[in-house]
Amino acid sequence: MSDPEPLPDHVARNRAYWDEINAPLYAAPGRRSWARDDITWGIFGVPETDLRALPDVEGKDVIELGCGTAYVSAWLARGGARVTGVDSSEEPLKTARALQDKHDLHVPLIHGNAEAVPLPDASFDLAVSEYGASIWADPYRWIPEAARLLRPGGELVFLVNGTLWVLTVPDTDAEGPAAERLLRPYFGMHRFEWPDEPGVEFHLGYGDWIRLLRANGFEVLDLIEIQAPPEAKGGRFDLVDPEWARKWPAEQIWRARRT
């Protein structure tokens, strides 16, 4: 499916970036996640049964915004949901389609921009993003789009990097994981361009998230700050030390309801 209009710069850059890094970094984790039935969250794989971030999805229409290899879509489909996945990058979707064939579990996958999804208003009961649109799309564009796609009473659940992690992680991977001191300002958080990566990330402070959600007709239900479990030995890509993540939240899940 082609994009209806020229892509914003950050969307085009992130599309090219993810097309490049999918195979070496994310295809194998995607295969492992597809092979599991249990839903887990984040870099330490904390079980959904512990966090209770999701509503009952059986019989619900669900959209995953920034689905990547679509393992979250697969988990939700196995739970009885009617799922549609959207991703800006074609390479992760190729992996997703191959895994759909392997596991004989197929959901619609759209190659498109999560900030401008080519689907009708009020089509879904739940919108989910697990490090997809939630950090790779501009929240001032994708949150209004999620609101448009959801029916009244529908829920939005999305996972992002913890605010403290964003403030304490060094500029480059070579400098190591998150530190125990602040490295950048909290106020004015929005667009992040790391020196060693060509992509563009987006992170907001707590107040900005709350105001943005409310401005788009959402009631904030919960903010789940994920703590690394005692048995955690390491996370994906060494972004954070487990001991750090046992003291401060490296990840957080927002839950909101469309009013």
Question: What are the residue ranges of the model-derived segments?
Answer:
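Class I SAM-dependent methyltransferase SAM/SAH-binding core
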Residues: 61-116
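A short glycine-rich, Lys/Arg-flanked "PGG" loop and its adjoining helix->strand segment in the class I
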Residues: 140-155
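Conserved class I S-adenosyl-L-methionine
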Residues: 155-190
